[in-house]
Protein backbone atom coordinates (compact mmCIF):
# COMPACT_ATOMS: atom_id res chain seq x y z
CA UNK A 1 0.00 0.00 0.00
CA UNK A 2 2.90 2.34 0.67
CA UNK A 3 3.71 2.67 -3.04
CA UNK A 4 0.56 1.48 -4.85
CA UNK A 5 -0.39 5.00 -5.92
CA UNK A 6 3.01 5.67 -7.54
CA UNK A 7 4.01 2.31 -9.05
CA UNK A 8 3.13 2.18 -12.72
CA UNK A 9 1.62 -1.28 -12.28
CA UNK A 10 -0.95 -0.08 -9.74
CA UNK A 11 -1.24 3.72 -10.05
CA UNK A 12 -4.23 3.85 -12.42
CA UNK A 13 -6.07 1.14 -10.49
CA UNK A 14 -5.43 2.99 -7.23
CA UNK A 15 -6.99 6.10 -8.73
CA UNK A 16 -10.22 4.53 -9.98
CA UNK A 17 -10.30 0.71 -10.17
CA UNK A 18 -10.67 -0.37 -6.58
CA UNK A 19 -12.56 -3.34 -5.24
CA UNK A 20 -13.26 -5.17 -2.02
CA UNK A 21 -12.31 -8.81 -1.77
CA UNK A 22 -14.47 -10.48 0.89
CA UNK A 23 -12.98 -13.31 2.91
CA UNK A 24 -13.89 -15.30 5.99
CA UNK A 25 -10.21 -15.19 6.95
CA UNK A 26 -6.72 -15.59 5.57
CA UNK A 27 -3.61 -17.70 6.02
CA UNK A 28 -0.15 -16.44 6.84
CA UNK A 29 3.00 -18.42 7.47
CA UNK A 30 5.69 -18.09 10.10
CA UNK A 31 8.42 -20.15 8.52
CA UNK A 32 6.77 -23.47 7.65
CA UNK A 33 3.91 -23.05 10.14
CA UNK A 34 0.56 -21.79 8.80
CA UNK A 35 -1.72 -19.56 10.85
CA UNK A 36 -5.32 -18.62 10.18
CA UNK A 37 -6.59 -15.08 10.86
CA UNK A 38 -10.31 -14.36 11.13
CA UNK A 39 -12.75 -11.78 12.52
CA UNK A 40 -14.03 -12.05 16.07
CA UNK A 41 -17.48 -13.12 14.87
CA UNK A 42 -17.70 -15.96 12.35
CA UNK A 43 -20.64 -14.29 10.62
CA UNK A 44 -18.51 -11.25 9.76
CA UNK A 45 -16.47 -11.16 6.56
CA UNK A 46 -13.17 -9.36 6.18
CA UNK A 47 -13.21 -6.65 3.53
CA UNK A 48 -9.76 -6.68 1.95
CA UNK A 49 -8.73 -3.69 -0.14
CA UNK A 50 -8.13 -4.73 -3.72
CA UNK A 51 -7.27 -3.25 -7.08
CA UNK A 52 -8.26 -4.56 -10.49
CA UNK A 53 -7.44 -3.94 -14.11
CA UNK A 54 -8.20 -5.34 -17.51
CA UNK A 55 -5.35 -6.36 -19.77
CA UNK A 56 -5.02 -7.78 -23.20
CA UNK A 57 -1.56 -9.20 -23.93
CA UNK A 58 -2.08 -8.95 -27.69
CA UNK A 59 -4.77 -8.00 -30.20
CA UNK A 60 -5.47 -11.71 -30.74
CA UNK A 61 -5.84 -12.38 -27.00
CA UNK A 62 -8.98 -12.30 -24.92
CA UNK A 63 -9.26 -9.58 -22.30
CA UNK A 64 -8.12 -10.73 -18.86
CA UNK A 65 -9.33 -9.38 -15.53
CA UNK A 66 -6.52 -9.15 -12.98
CA UNK A 67 -6.81 -8.32 -9.30
CA UNK A 68 -4.51 -7.88 -6.34
CA UNK A 69 -4.96 -7.55 -2.60
CA UNK A 70 -3.19 -4.56 -1.09
CA UNK A 71 -0.96 -5.28 1.89
CA UNK A 72 0.57 -3.07 4.55
CA UNK A 73 2.99 -3.49 7.46
CA UNK A 74 1.57 -5.90 10.03
CA UNK A 75 0.55 -4.67 13.49
CA UNK A 76 -0.19 -6.29 16.84
CA UNK A 77 -1.12 -10.01 16.62
CA UNK A 78 -0.54 -10.34 12.87
CA UNK A 79 2.96 -8.86 13.32
CA UNK A 80 3.93 -11.80 15.55
CA UNK A 81 3.49 -14.11 12.56
CA UNK A 82 4.46 -12.06 9.48
CA UNK A 83 5.70 -8.58 8.56
CA UNK A 84 2.81 -7.87 6.13
CA UNK A 85 -0.98 -8.20 6.31
CA UNK A 86 -3.94 -7.47 4.02
CA UNK A 87 -5.19 -3.89 4.13
CA UNK A 88 -8.71 -4.08 5.59
CA UNK A 89 -11.47 -1.67 4.54
CA UNK A 90 -13.52 -0.43 7.50
CA UNK A 91 -17.31 -0.49 6.97
CA UNK A 92 -17.43 3.31 7.15
CA UNK A 93 -15.02 3.65 4.20
CA UNK A 94 -16.55 1.08 1.84
CA UNK A 95 -18.49 3.56 -0.28
CA UNK A 96 -15.51 5.88 -0.69
CA UNK A 97 -13.17 3.00 -1.55
CA UNK A 98 -15.52 1.78 -4.28
CA UNK A 99 -16.29 5.24 -5.71
CA UNK A 100 -14.24 5.64 -8.93
CA UNK A 101 -14.70 9.43 -8.85
CA UNK A 102 -12.55 9.63 -5.69
CA UNK A 103 -8.78 9.33 -6.13
CA UNK A 104 -7.84 6.30 -4.04
CA UNK A 105 -4.39 7.71 -3.27
CA UNK A 106 -5.96 10.10 -0.76
CA UNK A 107 -7.79 7.22 0.95
CA UNK A 108 -4.75 5.02 1.58
CA UNK A 109 -3.38 6.70 4.74
CA UNK A 110 -6.69 7.00 6.63
CA UNK A 111 -7.71 3.51 5.56
CA UNK A 112 -4.38 2.08 6.69
CA UNK A 113 -4.91 3.61 10.15
CA UNK A 114 -8.52 2.41 10.46
CA UNK A 115 -7.68 -0.97 8.91
CA UNK A 116 -4.87 -1.49 11.43
CA UNK A 117 -7.42 -1.10 14.23
CA UNK A 118 -9.53 -3.86 12.63
CA UNK A 119 -6.49 -6.11 12.17
CA UNK A 120 -5.51 -5.69 15.82
CA UNK A 121 -8.80 -7.39 16.78
CA UNK A 122 -8.40 -10.44 14.55
CA UNK A 123 -8.31 -13.87 16.13
CA UNK A 124 -5.58 -16.21 14.96
CA UNK A 125 -4.29 -19.68 15.63
CA UNK A 126 -1.91 -22.19 14.14
CA UNK A 127 -3.44 -24.69 11.74
CA UNK A 128 -2.21 -27.90 10.14
CA UNK A 129 -0.33 -27.63 6.83
CA UNK A 130 -2.78 -26.78 4.07
CA UNK A 131 -3.49 -29.92 2.08
CA UNK A 132 -6.75 -30.61 0.34
CA UNK A 133 -9.83 -28.46 0.80
CA UNK A 134 -12.61 -27.94 3.31
CA UNK A 135 -13.43 -26.49 6.72
CA UNK A 136 -10.94 -28.76 8.49
CA UNK A 137 -8.14 -26.55 7.18
CA UNK A 138 -8.93 -23.80 9.69
CA UNK A 139 -9.17 -25.96 12.83
CA UNK A 140 -6.61 -25.03 15.50
CA UNK A 141 -3.72 -27.38 16.16
CA UNK A 142 -3.63 -28.67 19.73
CA UNK A 143 -0.03 -28.55 20.94
CA UNK A 144 1.14 -30.08 24.19
CA UNK A 145 3.46 -27.17 24.82
CA UNK A 146 2.66 -23.60 23.79
CA UNK A 147 4.37 -22.35 20.67
CA UNK A 148 6.76 -19.44 21.13
CA UNK A 149 6.38 -16.73 18.52
CA UNK A 150 9.61 -14.90 19.39
Model regions: which residues?
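A structured binding-face within diverse protein domains that lines the active/interaction site
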Residues: 1-150
Amino acid sequence: VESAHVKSTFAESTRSRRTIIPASGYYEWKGRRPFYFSPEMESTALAMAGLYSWRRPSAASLWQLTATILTCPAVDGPATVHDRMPLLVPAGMTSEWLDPSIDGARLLAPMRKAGAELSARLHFHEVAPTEGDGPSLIRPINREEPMRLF
